[in-house]
Amino acid sequence: MDLWDAIKEMRRLSAEGIPFGFTFMSYDATARASKGVIEVRHARLLKREKQENHRDAEFVEAYLDLDTCQARRFYQPLLMSFNGQKVV
């Protein structure tokens, strides 16, 4: 699945209140480190952040992990799979 098709589908499902799963490679820009592959089993995207609030807002998606009820973020280019389909 194409990266932008996956992001578009994530947004559509989130707007309809339908959870989805995905994996991504973690990256902490401040520490310049990764904690490896992160699997999120049930999530919904949150409203996009503004450039004033996050320097990489155009490349970052905020999501709610429905299993932990934590709001988190991932960098779009680091998305690896969406609902079991590999993202390229």
Question: What are these language model-derived features?
Answer:
Residues S26-T68:
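Short, conserved turn/kink motifs that form compact alpha/beta structural patches or helix kinks used as
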Residues R12, R44-L45, L78:
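Acidic/proline-rich low-complexity IDRs
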